[in-house]
Amino acid sequence: MGDNSAAAAAVAAPRGRFGRICVFCGSNAGNRAVFGDAALQLGQELVSRGIELVYGGGSVGLMGLIAQTVLDGGCGVLGVIPKALMPTEISGASVGEVKIVSDMHERKAEMARQSDAFIALPGGYGTMEELLEMITWSQLGIHDKPVGLLNVDGYYDPLLALFDKGAAEGFIKADCRQIIVSAPTAHELLRKMEQYTRSHQEVAPRTSWEMSELGYGKTPEES
């Protein structure tokens, strides 16, 4: 009965700015329960807003937690995973729809194509690299989608401090420092992302990029 109620609530939820959000996160759960709790809360927040999930396709770690939460809540889940990672990142049954791609570049490009915004939960090198690429693509003008950082228990404080250092030392323009939106809770982060408007001047207009070469220009309908 509870599952049916959650699914009905998700279907009935009014559509906001985002139909699908891409979440980058670890294939590990981390050493403290607070990280898993944050993944569950973000999943519940997406469900409450009727937002579908695009993610890295794994069924383990934080990836598995958020994917199962969104799926159980009645919202769509699309996982994008390179064939080479399937043995290590999928344990047992996959969660939701899974699209298999050839490599990491294609994975990021497909996740970006399918999403209206991006959020990074705590994670390792891969999560940080995905986050930084989406920030860079925004700076370059390849996309204008919000990029959010769920700063769970200060996990990303050092990274945010590094961004501030880069701006202070003249390597990151002040307006580009505003590309990243951060908050300690899922509810606050989604609220900020709903209100986000681009304030930086992109390096080049989106129409000037060879999107087919970058693997980014198609809409979900064209994919």
From Swiss-Prot:
Tissue expression notes: Expressed in shoot apex, immature inflorescences and flowers.
A GO BP term here is: cytokinin biosynthetic process
So what does this thing catalyse? N(6)-(dimethylallyl)adenosine 5'-phosphate + H2O = N(6)-dimethylallyladenine + D-ribose 5-phosphate; 9-ribosyl-trans-zeatin 5'-phosphate + H2O = trans-zeatin + D-ribose 5-phosphate
Q: Which Pfam families match?
A: Lysine_decarbox
Q: Output the NCBIfam families linked to this UniProt entry.
A: Rossman fold protein, TIGR00730 family
Cited PANTHER family:
CYTOKININ RIBOSIDE 5'-MONOPHOSPHATE PHOSPHORIBOHYDROLASE LOG8-RELATED, LOG FAMILY PROTEIN YJL055W
Q: In UniProt terms, what function does this protein have?
A: Cytokinin-activating enzyme working in the direct activation pathway. Phosphoribohydrolase that converts inactive cytokinin nucleotides to the biologically active free-base forms.
The name this protein goes by in its record? Probable cytokinin riboside 5'-monophosphate phosphoribohydrolase LOGL1
| Taxonomic path | Eukaryota, Viridiplantae, Streptophyta, Embryophyta, Tracheophyta
Gene name linked to the record: LOGL1
